[in-house]
Amino acid sequence: MPRNLVLFDLEWNIGYQPYTFNYHGVQQTFRGEIVEIGAVKIDEDANVLDTFSIHLKPRIFRKLQHHIAKVTGLTQADLDRGEPIVQGLRRFMQWCGPDAEFAEWGM
């Protein structure tokens, strides 16, 4: 059976201050949130089959941090027009398909 390999990269916006909240009695701290997903689907011979890119609208860190804009090329308008994360993740998973294997690019 041919492999369906998805190489993906996440871009994150960070807050100027961490965001801490109580979730079902457990203290949680967010330092950033995903604002873009980029991906390439390749076959077992490394042929590019398809590409995917989506901007996500942040819920917590809504203002694009200057350094993130500089590094990624994203704009505040990209984030403002982005899809809600749940909807965006659903679209990404549908694009990946049920037999996808994943590899992440990041540092």
For each of these PLM feature ranges, what is it?
Residues 2-107:
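Conserved non-catalytic scaffold segment of RNase H-like nuclease domains
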